[in-house]
């Protein structure tokens, strides 16, 4: 409208009583504070915890912050963000760094008030501080524990006075971003990798490399109906994407395999953001659109690799829809083709990438020969009643990988969300290279695509990386991880944890004749996750957990 313009401003309310929020569980009020963080001048919001157990569980993270602050006194206040999520060393003793917060007292660090004192506005007995004059505002550390007010008014150009009443919106109290308990990288021999180690130089000199597999939960599936136990703000994509990125970058994996990555999120967020951290990106979208018909909501598999560690050689895209059409044309009678296609066409895909290592390793038989690695990243159909479709998709992928393996001596990595629990036919095919003809899953085969059962086999010597935990002797340092494994299957007790389901659906398989597992990312325990009912939560932004394995290429035997 001519002669008028909008004017926006933001304010923070100053209360007499300060409210501290737990840095790990932001829905909880803090009752304890880490004095070590206060003395180290780490941002005070990161020092609060809701219970002694909460603090104890996060103690390794605090130790790292204290050590880094002590060795780099000139570091800025974002130090803890830089090492968020990295692997931490073991330690004990937390009581000396803990103090209780009295609910009636003012929270300070001993010398300086927690919040600023410049008054800019007083309304109705409340004191407000102006924090911005733009259409958008990102809360800062100073805002934690406070209510914010956003005000928008229409101003007359000539008089510079408001026209009518300003529109005002009040927020809930600002809470700090949660700090998930750091996960350690544990050697399968039981020796943890120290956090102060320079992981980059370690990997380059030793010839090992790390692979991460993670279903990040597509925004299209992250609905309030499915995950009503997760606060809406923690379920929003604007929040989850930053939390996921921080977690993924913190693992510093050489190869990253993500599932349920939406097309628009890949192009507009993950690819450019991970590029800043030295990753090259490849993506394969599923072959159909989800819910709205908007092509941007279609999810797929994304594979990233560090440019300083690997070079891209070749990419293969597996569309199970096309394979289903070929199978139907070749084997299914004409009268059943429509029914067969309806059952088999489920839009799942796999992305296969061949990479060349840039680091020295002992896997090559002469210094001038390059080391190749083949990485498959897939997301198998989710419907539990389609057992035949799941098995057929996994079998189709493995037969394709067999052809690649036959063309060159190349280590294989098969990562992803297989939507198949340990002991299922797809898992048996992956882990045992065959399926027992009497397996109960084979009873579901209305199209007879799994017969004879003897054809359900492959020649790849695949082993589940996390089964290394179960195979190791009960040495000190591994007991906790062994308790998080299922001894009957040699797989984790769970990689997917929701209110209605808990179990393992994600795996990293490797070719045992050419690779050996050096270390594994520790597993999470169900008790800690159930504090927030299940996943996703403010702490962990997917309903799956990330898996990571460190590998070394075995020396090749000359033929």
List where the protein language model places each region.
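Active-site beta-strand/loop signature of hydrolases that rely on acidic residues for catalysis
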Residues: 211-217, 240-270, 352-353, 374-378, ...
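Ser/Thr/Pro/Gly-rich low-complexity disordered regions
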Residues: 1-48, 52-207
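Amphipathic alpha-helical interaction motifs in eukaryotic regulatory proteins
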Residues: 23, 35-38, 50-51, 55, ...
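Acidic/histidine-rich helix-loop elements
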Residues: 217-238, 326-330, 343, 384
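Hydrophobic beta-strand positions in extracellular immunoglobulin-like domains
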Residues: 152-154, 355, 551
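Eukaryotic serine/proline-rich intrinsically disordered regulatory segments
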Residues: 65-119, 179-184, 291, 319-340, ...
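Metal-dependent phosphoester-hydrolase catalytic domains
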Residues: 309, 345, 359-365, 385-388, ...
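Structured beta-strand-rich core segments of catalytic domains in phosphoester-bond hydrolases
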Residues: 180-208, 255-381, 386, 456-459, ...
């Amino acid at each position: 409208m001519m002669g008028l313009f909008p004017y926006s401003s933001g304010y923070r309310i100053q209360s007499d009583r300060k409210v501290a929020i737990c840095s790990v569980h932001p829905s909880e009020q803090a009752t304890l504070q880490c004095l070590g963080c206060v003395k180290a001048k780490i941002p005070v919001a990161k020092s609060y915890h809701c219970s002694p157990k909460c603090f104890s569980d996060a103690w390794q993270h605090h130790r790292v912050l204290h050590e880094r602050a002590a060795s780099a006194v000139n570091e800025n206040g974002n130090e803890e963000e830089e090492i968020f999520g990295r692997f931490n060393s073991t330690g004990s003793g937390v009581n000396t760094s803990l103090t209780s917060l009295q609910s009636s007292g003012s929270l300070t660090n001993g010398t300086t008030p927690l919040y600023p004192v410049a008054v800019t506005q007083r309304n109705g007995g409340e004191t407000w501080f102006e924090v911005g004059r733009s259409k958008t505002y990102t809360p800062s550390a100073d805002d934690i524990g406070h209510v914010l007010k956003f005000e928008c008014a229409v101003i007359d150009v000539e008089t510079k006075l408001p026209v009518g009443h300003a529109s005002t919106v009040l927020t809930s109290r600002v809470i700090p971003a949660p700090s998930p308990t750091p996960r350690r990288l544990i050697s399968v021999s039981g020796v943890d990798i120290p956090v102060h180690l320079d992981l980059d130089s370690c990997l380059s000199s030793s010839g090992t490399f790390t692979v991460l597999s993670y279903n990040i939960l597509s925004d299209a599936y992250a609905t309030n109906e499915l995950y009503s136990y997760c606060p809406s703000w923690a379920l929003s994509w604007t929040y989850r994407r930053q939390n996921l990125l921080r977690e993924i970058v913190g693992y510093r994996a050489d190869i990253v395999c993500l599932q349920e990555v939406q097309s628009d999120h890949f192009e507009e967020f993950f690819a450019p953001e991970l590029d800043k951290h030295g990753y090259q990106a490849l993506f394969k979208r599923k072959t159909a659109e989800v819910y709205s018909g908007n092509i941007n909501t279609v999810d797929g598999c994304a594979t990233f690799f560090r440019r300083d560690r690997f070079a891209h050689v070749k990419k293969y895209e597996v569309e199970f829809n096309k394979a289903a059409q070929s199978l139907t044309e070749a084997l299914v009678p004409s009268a059943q083709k429509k029914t067969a296609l309806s059952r088999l066409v489920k839009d799942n895909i796999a992305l296969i990438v061949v990479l060349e290592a840039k680091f020295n390793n002992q896997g090559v038989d002469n210094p001038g020969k390059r080391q190749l690695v083949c990485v498959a990243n897939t997301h198998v159909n989710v419907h539990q009643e389609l057992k035949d479709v799941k098995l057929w998709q996994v079998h189709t992928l493995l037969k394709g990988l067999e052809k690649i393996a036959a063309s060159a001596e190349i280590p294989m990595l098969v990562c992803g969300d297989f939507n198949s629990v340990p002991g299922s036919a797809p898992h048996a095919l992956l882990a045992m290279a065959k399926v027992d003809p009497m397996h109960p899953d084979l009873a579901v085969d209305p199209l007879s695509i799994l017969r004879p059962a003897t054809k359900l086999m492959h020649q790849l010597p695949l082993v589940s990386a996390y089964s290394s935990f179960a195979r190791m002797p009960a040495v000190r340092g591994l007991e906790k991880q062994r308790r998080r494994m299922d001894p009957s299957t040699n797989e984790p007790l769970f990689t997917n944890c929701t209110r209605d389901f808990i179990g393992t659906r994600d795996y990293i398989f490797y070719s045992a004749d050419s690779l050996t597992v050096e270390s594994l990312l520790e597993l999470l325990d169900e008790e800690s996750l159930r504090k927030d009912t299940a996943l996703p939560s403010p702490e962990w932004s997917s309903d799956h957990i990330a898996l990571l394995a460190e590998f070394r290429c075995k020396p090749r035997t000359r033929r």
